[in-house]
Amino acid sequence: MKVFKQQLEQLGAQNQYRSIPDLIHQGRYITRENRKMLNMSSNDYLGLASDENLRRSFLQQYGGNFPSFTSSSSRLLTGNFPIYTDLEELVAQRFQRESALLFNSGYHANLGILPALTTTKSLILADKFVHASMIDGIRLSRCAFFRYRHNDYEHLKNLLEKNVGKFDRTFIVTESVFSMDGDVADLKQLVQLKKQFPNTYLYVDEAHAIGVYGQNGLGIAERDNLIAEIDLLVGTFGKALASVGAYAVCNQVLKECLINQMRPLIFSTALPPFNVAWTYFIFERLPQFSKERSHLEQLSAFLRREVAHRTQIMPSQTCIVPYILGGNEATLAKAEYLQRQGYYCLPIRPSTVPKNTSRIRLSLTADMTTDEVRQFAACL
């Protein structure tokens, strides 16, 4: 045990030690250590997680005859239920694509997709700032990979040109909305690049965009009218949609490859049908939340301006607003100060973000009021 204790002590000395907090949730507020705070760190972007009317409508819809609370098995064995197919068909229909496939989480999706669709003769080109789950999936793929500079498409093009004809297939991998900086990939440029090179596929993670952007809440790909051009469009139900699980939208051939070769799908007990039914209920209503999306954008634009006055770096274009302070100690101190003022703000440190870019990741939700965000900005 000595070596493990030393590792923990080293993390503590670097202000990188983590622990799981004890929290009580009350709508958009969180209570921690008897301190009630406005939650400025949530991914509940549309504010649906605590919407009692939605919850009541969902429960009344089933009248006590609820779907099973467990699947008890992988979908490929005895764990498949009609509600899974219903949701996949709904997702595919809304995206106007051939097929969709459900996963237990965004992490499961990103961990398993690339290993299932690549060989040792393949190439992966990933944005430098893609999520840790995508990096883990890339590592498990056991194929060649390079990380192009963040949103630097000249660098990406250079890598594509250097590797023409060397691999059986190439995957370009990116997020649409980046989870730590809140900036947005140029999907149009990525689609254009993909088309210039043979056997090249585009894989976009919309975890922080689904529900929030696009006329129907289908993400940046919908906003930019590019859904049909993206080979693998992945998103999560656990953020703006206030549920659990994830999906991939793709063609039928890729779906069947994933069903046959994706280990996290094949060897995991499927999500409880009850949760999938709740996801269906929310996803079906996604186009109806345009007022929430509009209000969230107004709040986000205001907070981005306020934070930009106080930091040298403001990459955000979304409701994820990084307040970059640099060092771990300063970031921890600022987070503690804001919590004392009644705002649940959390420090983000390396290795989650690059060294010397420690920050408070501010995340807005549509159930916040304009006055609440103004008062928070004054505390900064």
Swiss-Prot record:
One Pfam family it belongs to: Aminotran_1_2
InterPro entries linked: Aminotrans_II_pyridoxalP_BS, Aminotransferase_I/II_large, AON_synthase_class-II, AONS_Archaea/Proteobacteria, PyrdxlP-dep_Trfase, PyrdxlP-dep_Trfase_major, PyrdxlP-dep_Trfase_small
Family of the protein in this entry: Belongs to the class-II pyridoxal-phosphate-dependent aminotransferase family. BioF subfamily.
UniProt pathway: Cofactor biosynthesis; biotin biosynthesis
EC number: 2.3.1.47
Residues binding pyridoxal 5'-phosphate: G106, Y107, S179, D205, E206, A207, H208, T236, F237, G238, K239
GO biological process: biotin biosynthetic process
GO molecular function, one term: 8-amino-7-oxononanoate synthase activity
Segments traversing the membrane: none
Highest taxon listed in the record's lineage: Bacteria
Biological role: Catalyzes the decarboxylative condensation of pimeloyl-[acyl-carrier protein] and L-alanine to produce 8-amino-7-oxononanoate (AON), [acyl-carrier protein], and carbon dioxide.
Residues noted as binding substrate in the record, renumbered to the chain: R18, H131, T352
Name of the protein: Putative 8-amino-7-oxononanoate synthase
Quaternary organization: Homodimer.
NCBIfam families assigned to the protein according to its UniProt record, in alphabetical order: bioF
PROSITE patterns: AA_TRANSFER_CLASS_2
Annotated keywords: Biotin biosynthesis, Pyridoxal phosphate, Transferase
Disulfide bonds: none
